[in-house]
């Protein structure tokens, strides 16, 4: 069985039926200035039962491509956010 990436981030948008937009933050060291900087990336995540709401912290796991940009599915809601 292949290794599946697990990402954790904040739901920033309900992108449509069964889809949420997830903002994932990572910290990297700048190559020249050696300062820790934040980098952000948005992922589209498949939410089969429309459980996630804007502001929630969720975990998503990689799966087969569901659409052109959507290849993660919702695993669990870690923390419910305040709308």
UniProtKB/Swiss-Prot annotation:
Keyword RNA-binding among record annotations: yes
Entry's Gene Ontology cellular component terms: cytosolic small ribosomal subunit
MF-aspect GO terms: rRNA binding; structural constituent of ribosome
Ranges in coiled-coil conformation: none
Keywords: Ribonucleoprotein, Ribosomal protein, RNA-binding, rRNA-binding
Record flagged with keyword rRNA-binding: yes
GO process annotations (BP): translation
Oligomer status and interactors: Part of the 30S ribosomal subunit.
UniProt similarity note: Belongs to the universal ribosomal protein uS17 family.
Function per UniProt: One of the primary rRNA binding proteins, it binds specifically to the 5'-end of 16S ribosomal RNA.
Name the record gives this protein: Small ribosomal subunit protein uS17
Gene designation per UniProt: rpsQ
